[in-house]
Amino acid sequence: MASSCSRRLLAAALLPWCCAAWALGHLDPPSPPPLVIWHGMGDSCCNPMSMGVIKKMVEKEIPGIYVLSLEIGKNMMEDVENSFFLNVNVQVNMVCQILEKDPKLQQGYNAIGFSQGGQFLRAVAQRCPTPPMMTLISVGGQHQGVFGLPRCPGESSHICDFIRKSLNAGAYSKLVQERLVQAQYWHDPIKESVYRNYSIFLADINQERCVNESYKKNLMALKKFVMVKFFNDSIVDPVDSEWFGFYRSGQAKETIPLQESTLYTEDRLGLKKMDKAGKLVFLAKEGDHLQISKEWFTAHIIPFLK
């Protein structure tokens, strides 16, 4: 029979393990990664019919998640106006500062960009690695730009008529480039050299003029880069841009996929390495621009946010 001294020694040895097991059993489950959302053209952070719905949907499906829907400006009206008229580089810089100062994002975050918000958040990933973006989901984003503005959503059509005329008159003039957001990702495949030299946003983040190794390194740090393409999109021209494809240089009829582009074959942005590593995810959906049901969003997007 064990002596009382032996029993005391055994109890003393087991006590720390018992306490540790008890503590582990009572730890709160880890919080889900926070989410940052950037809306599209003519929309706002908090529109109850668009981004407000998305925010509530995410919060319902992932209890306890922190969702930051970006407002570019002092109020919703200014947010909408800035989606048309505030220099994208200024917007990206503003967002980088917002994210850097938010204590809830410092361990990393996931991001969803809707329409032009997709390429804007990619610029954030490339230019501002702190705090780290983990997964980027681009829903209808135009990563190789657009060459046409066929239709505008909602009540913004009159603004788009003005923008369309300005783009046709001189998309790469200094005045238009600095004052119209859509001009800053306007990509003329017939005038590639003009685009490369005078595009103040897209040509930069797509490494058209030179290779910024920091951009490449920062983008490759993503765990996943998810791109959603809408087969019946009547707003994005060409729709292939939503998967990083575009018109073959020198004409505006035949499109080529990302994998046939110089950006990919020369791996100027790290997309080829990301593709080989399984980090690029290409999702396709029937329907027009940003036509997403709750069921589709829950089945295809929510899993990337957990």
Curated annotation (Swiss-Prot):
**In the record, which residues are listed under signal peptide?**
1-27
Which Gene Ontology CC terms are recorded? axon; cytosol; dendrite; extracellular region; extracellular space; Golgi apparatus; lysosomal membrane; lysosome
Task: Describe the disruption phenotype.
Answer: Ppt1-knockout mice are viable and fertile; however they developp a neurodegenerative disorder that closely parallels infantile neuronal ceroid lipofuscinosis disease. Mortality reached 50% among the deficient mice by 7 months and few mice survived past 10 months.
Q: Does the keyword Nucleotide-binding apply?
A: no
An example of a Gene Ontology BP annotation on this entry? associative learning
Q: How is it modified after translation?
A: Glycosylated.
Q: Which domain of life is it from?
A: Eukaryota
Q: Which reaction does it catalyse?
A: S-hexadecanoyl-L-cysteinyl-[protein] + H2O = L-cysteinyl-[protein] + hexadecanoate + H(+); hexadecanoyl-CoA + H2O = hexadecanoate + CoA + H(+); S-hexadecanoyl-N-acetylcysteamine + H2O = N-acetylcysteamine + hexadecanoate + H(+); S-hexadecanoyl-N-acetylcysteine methyl ester + H2O = N-acetylcysteine methyl ester + hexadecanoate + H(+)
- Residues carrying covalently attached carbohydrate according to the record: N197, N212, N232
Q: Where in the cell is it found?
A: Lysosome; Secreted; Golgi apparatus; Endoplasmic reticulum
**Gene Ontology molecular function:** long-chain fatty acyl-CoA hydrolase activity; lysophosphatidic acid binding; palmitoyl-(protein) hydrolase activity; phospholipase A2 inhibitor activity; sulfatide binding
Please name the catalytic residues of this protein. S115, D233, H289
Which SUPFAM superfamilies does this UniProt record tie to the protein?
alpha/beta-Hydrolases
Q: What class of enzyme is it?
A: hydrolase
Subunit and interaction comment? Interacts with CLN5, ATP5F1A and ATP5F1B.
What does this protein do, in the record's words?
Answer: Has thioesterase activity against fatty acid thioesters with 14 -18 carbons, including palmitoyl-CoA, S-palmitoyl-N-acetylcysteamine, and palmitoylated proteins. In contrast to PPT2, PPT1 can hydrolyze palmitoylated proteins and palmitoylcysteine.
Q: What family does the entry list? A: Belongs to the palmitoyl-protein thioesterase family.
Q: What is this protein called?
A: Palmitoyl-protein thioesterase 1
Could you tell me which species this protein originates from? Answer: Mus musculus
The UniProt gene name for this protein comes to: Ppt1
